Swiss-Prot record:
The protein's name: tRNA (pseudouridine(54)-N(1))-methyltransferase
Lineage, uppermost ranks: Archaea, Methanobacteriati, Methanobacteriota, Methanomada group, Methanococci
Keyword Cytoplasm: yes
Pfam families in the cross-refs: Methyltrn_RNA_2 (PF04013)
UniProt gene name: trmY
Listed EC numbers: 2.1.1.257
Gene3D superfamilies the record matches: 3.40.1280.10
Quaternary structure, from the entry: Homodimer.
Major location (coarse): cytoplasm
Reaction(s) the record says it catalyses: pseudouridine(54) in tRNA + S-adenosyl-L-methionine = N(1)-methylpseudouridine(54) in tRNA + S-adenosyl-L-homocysteine + H(+)
Length: 198
């Protein structure tokens, strides 16, 4: 199982989304939509072995955590507008500590970024923090019988406090490239590496 968790610092936390201006009025919701696309969409199928989380910290009601479960997703198209519509529907639900399903395979809750990561850590999953200044990918060994969790930041990053938190819990800091990459491109690169283990 592959899981991705991204912290979205400015993305709105209600359903008032302007589908014509995802980057501006919705706090870079376009970036999250592209990450969903990269996490799941193949040429003629979906990745069923993947779960994607985005924890939104924009106004007016942060945090809102969104969960996309690959083996449950239905009717989602790969374009940003379609994905944004499904996110809009999820954000229109009243979020609580319990995960609530808005459409097949898409859930929302009031879980915090750190709480989701701690849950994965307690489940015994291997936690990686994708960062430009991490150790080169070539220095890590991946086994196809392991469960992996990859932490990403948006265009702002995750912030110093959350970086310290990841260090405290023993997350492995990994770099995919000597260049700074978009989060959605990082997801594709991770998939490519792990696909080769099969």
């Amino acid at each position: 199982m592959k899981e991705f968790i991204i912290k979205a610092n400015k993305t709105v936390t209600n359903g008032e989304i302007n589908l014509k201006d995802l980057p501006g009025s919705s706090g870079r919701l376009d970036l999250i939509c592209r990450c969903v696309n990269s996490a799941f969409f193949l040429s003629h199928d979906l990745r069923r072995d993947t779960i994607f989380y985005s924890v939104l910290y924009g106004p007016p009601n942060p945090p809102i955590a969104l969960q996309f479960v690959g083996n449950e997703l239905k009717r989602v198209s790969p374009d940003e507008r379609s994905i944004a519509l499904f996110i809009k529907k999820a954000l229109e639900k009243d979020a609580s500590e319990l995960w609530k399903e808005s459409t097949s395979g898409i859930y929302s809750s009031k879980w915090e970024f750190r709480d989701i990561i701690l849950k994965k850590k307690n489940e015994g999953k291997r936690i990686f923090y994708l960062h430009l200044n991490g150790k080169p990918l070539e220095n890590f060994e991946f086994k196809n019988d392991e469960d992996f969790v990859f932490i990403l930041g948006d265009h702002i990053g995750i912030g110093e406090e959350d970086e310290e938190f990841l260090e405290e819990i023993g997350a492995e800091k990994i770099s995919l490239s000597p260049l700074e990459l978009h989060a959605d491109h990082c997801i594709i690169l991770v998939h490519n590496i792990l696909d080769k283990l099969k």
